[in-house]
Amino acid sequence: MSLLMFTQLLLCGFLYVRVDGSRLRQEDFPPRIVEHPSDVIVSKGEPTTLNCKAEGRPTPTIEWYKDGERVETDKDDPRSHRMLLPSGSLFFLRIVHGRRSKPDEGSYVCVARNYLGEAVSRNASLEVALLRDDFRQNPTDVVVAAGEPAILECQPPRGHPEPTIYWKKDKVRIDDKEERISIRGGKLMISNTRKSDAGMYTCVGTNMVGERDSDPAELTVFERPTFLRRPINQVVLEEEAVEFRCQVQGDPQPTVRWKKDDADLPRGRYDIKDDYTLRIKKTMSTDEGTYMCIAENRVGKMEASATLTVRAPPQFVVRPRDQIVAQGRTVTFPCETKGNPQPAVFWQKEGSQNLLFPNQPQQPNSRCSVSPTGDLTITNIQRSDAGYYICQALTVAGSILAKAQLEVTDVLTDRPPPIILQGPANQTLAVDGTALLKCKATGDPLPVISWLKEGFTFPGRDPRATIQEQGTLQIKNLRISDTGTYTCVATSSSGETSWSAVLDVTESGATISKNYDLSDLPGPPSKPQVTDVTKNSVTLSWQPGTPGTLPASAYIIEAFSQSVSNSWQTVANHVKTTLYTVRGLRPNTIYLFMVRAINPQGLSDPSPMSDPVRTQDISPPAQGVDHRQVQKELGDVLVRLHNPVVLTPTTVQVTWTVDRQPQFIQGYRVMYRQTSGLQATSSWQNLDAKVPTERSAVLVNLKKGVTYEIKVRPYFNEFQGMDSESKTVRTTEEAPSAPPQSVTVLTVGSYNSTSISVSWDPPPPDHQNGIIQEYKIWCLGNETRFHINKTVDAAIRSVIIGGLFPGIQYRVEVAASTSAGVGVKSEPQPIIIGRRNEVVITENNNSITEQITDVVKQPAFIAGIGGACWVILMGFSIWLYWRRKKRKGLSNYAVTFQRGDGGLMSNGSRPGLLNAGDPSYPWLADSWPATSLPVNNSNSGPNEIGNFGRGDVLPPVPGQGDKTATMLSDGAIYSSIDFTTKTSYNSSSQITQATPYATTQILHSNSIHELAVDLPDPQWKSSIQQKTDLMGFGYSLPDQNKGNNGGKGGKKKKNKNSSKPQKNNGSTWANVPLPPPPVQPLPGTELEHYAVEQQENGYDSDSWCPPLPVQTYLHQGLEDELEEDDDRVPTPPVRGVASSPAISFGQQSTATLTPSPREEMQPMLQAHLDELTRAYQFDIAKQTWHIQSNNQPPQPPVPPLGYVSGALISDLETDVADDDADDEEEALEIPRPLRALDQTPGSSMDNLDSSVTGKAFTSSQRPRPTSPFSTDSNTSAALSQSQRPRPTKKHKGGRMDQQPALPHRREGMTDEEALVPYSKPSFPSPGGHSSSGTASSKGSTGPRKTEVLRAGHQRNASDLLDIGYMGSNSQGQFTGEL
């Protein structure tokens, strides 16, 4: 038991120890290096420390390793000079280092260990400092000239670390802060050395070991030679003595020697004295040259030269020659001279005063320059450059000159065909070999190389043959079939050149001739020079080229001329010499030449092309002009130029006189150029006066306000004489014709600034028209009190304008000003400165509203409007007074019409049918009210006829039968005629064809309601009816003095004694045939003449007008009125038996009541009026009316059908606008009679014998309204032009219903308005013909062709509006039924 307990206790204790030990070891951690050793450099024998610190649990142990081996420390060996410090650092008491043994130098690491692991530090090197004694490079002595830089260089001894360097001068350290001294590496640099810089210099190398001094070096500073007295240029005559002095100084003393033209002086002729003076006893021309005194010492050399000039007459070394150059090219005329002194060479174009000198600064626009040697070069040749150029050489000993001609040709003239430099050579090659046929060409433009074989294009599609980049033809795998002649063709826009060679392909083993080597060929000859030119020959000379393997044995000369061929031609073969004359050339032809050399190996490359040369021309035998004589005489001509006269700002007249007139003068050349307003003087412009006796010319198209230089020169062919003296003239100025450019407006200043900056550029130079003197700036507000104007000098291009008001729109304009005035203003630049300096640049184009507002606010506009209103008011008052006064005399008279067997009886000189809208009827103008109000509850559309003129009447509106409207103006009394019992007017026995009558008035739809009557008896009779009598026949005459109650909104408007009744909404009207005018003319009438006159005058009425009613007018003083209006009413023409169908429907009716101006026609008028009255009273009793009522209360009938009176010319001119305006404000209310009945006529006017009947409909049976007019075969086709088709619906009888046309009153016709068709009523005439009505419209001035419409039309009851319809049956009896 006890043993068991002991065992248990022992086990528990063991477990406790294990558990407790595990808890303690959990706090241990492996070592970690917290401080690593660093590299160190230390001197030999000096102490040093390598630091290392580590942490860990348990505390780690530290060991050191050098180059991988453990370091022995004092712990290992107490005598060791290395000690391991408690912190772990390794301390060296001294560094041991020797040549062979280096125990301390190496790479060290420290290692920290415990039972959990180890940590290794970074490597740290320990190096031993070293500095050797010997310099790798010691400085050397330096000798420099004063002012030059000096450089001393050394390399310090080897050491570690690398030693640094500094310098000592005379054992004193040099301060390198001085600007002239700099030390870079081992170099000491002293710039701009001085004498004081001379001395002994030592280089010192140092590092942590110590210092080492180099061997000393000496810096020596010398002085270059300088001249105390220089030789000077001298000019002497031949045989004179001359001396050149030369005195110098320097350190060391320099030596002096002389040279002439960079060569030593020849002995014998020159003496040099002790003071180095050069003396020439007797000068000759060969002594001329440059003599140089040379002073030299150790540090430098100085030279001074002087020129000796020996005077002698000038001579030409190279003379200028004639040249031919294409436009746009460059030409050079050589002119080399010699002389003593050297001649001054200058050039001049013959006839020009401008001289060109060598080394002269070239003008910006000049294309000519002269080289120092005297060569004249002209670039970009122009046609105007052609002429003679003179080279002149001038010295004190004399002068010489030479002349050469420049001929300018077309561009292609100087562009020869391509040149083949090397062409293919004859070759013999074996089968399966490779052939190379060379072809190298050049030219301008670069030519294209192509090949031909036996004249055909090659290689084609053969893959064995290719053309290489340089044009060489290569053929691989040769075959026997490749044998042939191959031609190389070089082609460009200037022509083509070809070169042929033979290729012979043989079997293997045959003799093979290889291609030549270029090195075996001779070199190209030099450029051929032209030595002589005749009419048909040119002599050339050249120099041989470099010889090849074999020298050249002969030469070939090739030539080209644009006028002869387009390729190079061989003109000479096997030429043995280098001088040859080419013959057989054309006269006056330009040629180019080139030469090739020949040797047994082949041809050389061509020589450079010769200059273009023109053969001489064949002078006309009769001319025999001696050029020298011509030039001499032209040189003697003296032209005196007068002061030019300015004619206009762009024209100047030039006049001159000539002292004597020589034989050889063809004319005078006026030369002028602009000299002001340009940076450089412009070129001369020419105006030739080709008449020798001419002494004046006018220069045109000149610039305004510009100064011109003018001179005059005589000429004869290409020869030109001396210029006159130059005169200057200034054209007059004008105001600038263009505004300143690039006008910009910007704001300037601070946040709340009210200033703007305006900048601009001058107007274009061509539009300045003079010298700009100032600029004017306008800053215009919307009111004059805001305007700000400024004027600035012409040199100013911007200005600041202040004091602008915020919120005001300003327009900124700028204009330039010359002495002639202010020019065109710039476009306005709108700108608005906001309340918070918000600048708003508005668009340039103001809105129409703003523009109108600006105009309306102008005082002139307001005054003009006020004056115009006053004039209109006064005119209206005068017209109103005259009109009322005149109406009082028109209200008590009547005119009646009657028709007898012979036709309509009128006043003896007028047909009975009148046009109410024609100004020829002055007393009828106010008889008819006008309306344009639409129909209530009716279908309307945009295509309805809506143009109603004076005399139009709308029907009454249903439901308003208790109201009546005034239908007539005061003074108009209407009566009607019954034609029911009369015989037919449309009998087939009497008429076979209807013809239009030029003066028949078309009845407008609304006019039927004014007088609704049946067609009358052939015998028209008149009767003065009272209103009560007419009421029995269903007529309603308006009360002329009764006011109208109507209008818009139920408002009442007074209408006292007014001819303008109020308007009322009405329906469209039916159309009823009307009685025609007489076919036979009345005695004394001239209807035909009148019709033609109306066509010629293109008469046009103001609006649509209804026909004149058959009615009577009471008129007093008719004859006076007729005389008063005689001048305004044309006399009707004489009418023939039948009207011509060609009469246009577009012509207005010419029927009027105006009598003939002849006094004898007035009694006849009164007789006709009486007859009409009696006939009418007789026929009234025979009228029969059948009225059907639908239990409706009796309604007053509409006014009778008839003809509408014309208007006075004065009324038409003054009343129309006023009446129209009033009509638009008033509505006419008209009672609607017989509302239960409507008429639907059937019309078939293709057959004039057919009947025209009416059929009654009740209001409940009314069909859709139809067109306001019935159309027949003679109706104008204008309806189809003025109205678009509307949907139709078929009814019984096959008639078509159409939508009603709503009338609208318009102020003027538009392009959409056309003629209103109307069925022509046909009436019997003694001649068996009938007259047809015509349709007319406003704006119709010419004849219109008619179109037959073969269709019956059903008329809506609303169109007829209970009117008694008039028709005719087959027997010709007219019937009416209500």
Curated annotation (Swiss-Prot):
- Pfam families of this UniProt entry? fn3, I-set, Ig_3
Where Phosphoserine occurs, the residues are 1156
Q: Membrane-spanning regions, if any?
A: 860-880
All copies of domain Ig-like C2-type, residue ranges: 31-127, 133-220, 225-309, 314-409, 418-504
Coiled-coil intervals = none
Question: In Gene Ontology terms, what is a biological process of this protein?
Answer: brain development
One GO MF term on file is: identical protein binding
Q: Which UniProt keywords apply?
A: Chemotaxis, Chromosomal rearrangement, Developmental protein, Differentiation, Disease variant, Disulfide bond, Glycoprotein, Immunoglobulin domain, Membrane, Neurogenesis, Phosphoprotein, Receptor, Repeat, Signal, Transmembrane, Transmembrane helix
* Domain Fibronectin type-III: from-to ranges: 524-618, 637-735, 739-836
Q: Sugar-bearing residues?
A: 123, 426, 752, 782, 789, 845
Question: What is the annotated signal peptide range for this record?
Answer: 1-21
Q: Where is the composition biased (Polar residues)?
A: 1141-1155, 1240-1285
Q: Acidic residues bias located where? A: 1215-1228
Which region ranges are annotated with the description Disordered? 603-625, 1032-1084, 1124-1156, 1215-1348
List every position bearing Phosphothreonine. Answer: 1154
Q: Where is the composition biased (Low complexity)?
A: 1058-1067, 1319-1343
Question: What is the role of this chain?
Answer: Receptor for SLIT2, and probably SLIT1, which are thought to act as molecular guidance cue in cellular migration, including axonal navigation at the ventral midline of the neural tube and projection of axons to different regions during neuronal development.
PANTHER family documented for this protein: CTX-RELATED TYPE I TRANSMEMBRANE PROTEIN, DPR-INTERACTING PROTEIN ETA, ISOFORM B-RELATED
The disease tied to this protein in UniProt is:
Vesicoureteral reflux 2: A disease belonging to the group of congenital anomalies of the kidney and urinary tract. It is characterized by the reflux of urine from the bladder into the ureters and sometimes into the kidneys, and is a risk factor for urinary tract infections. Primary disease results from a developmental defect of the ureterovesical junction. In combination with intrarenal reflux, the resulting inflammatory reaction may result in renal injury or scarring, also called reflux nephropathy. A chromosomal aberration involving ROBO2 is a cause of multiple congenital abnormalities, including severe bilateral VUR with ureterovesical junction defects. Translocation t(Y;3)(p11;p12) with PCDH11Y. This translocation disrupts ROBO2 and produces dominant-negative ROBO2 proteins that abrogate SLIT-ROBO signaling in vitro.
- Subunit structure, briefly? Interacts with SLIT2.
Please report the name of this protein according to its UniProt entry. Answer: Roundabout homolog 2
Q: Which organism is it from?
A: Homo sapiens (Human)
Upper classification of the organism:
Eukaryota, Metazoa, Chordata, Craniata, Vertebrata
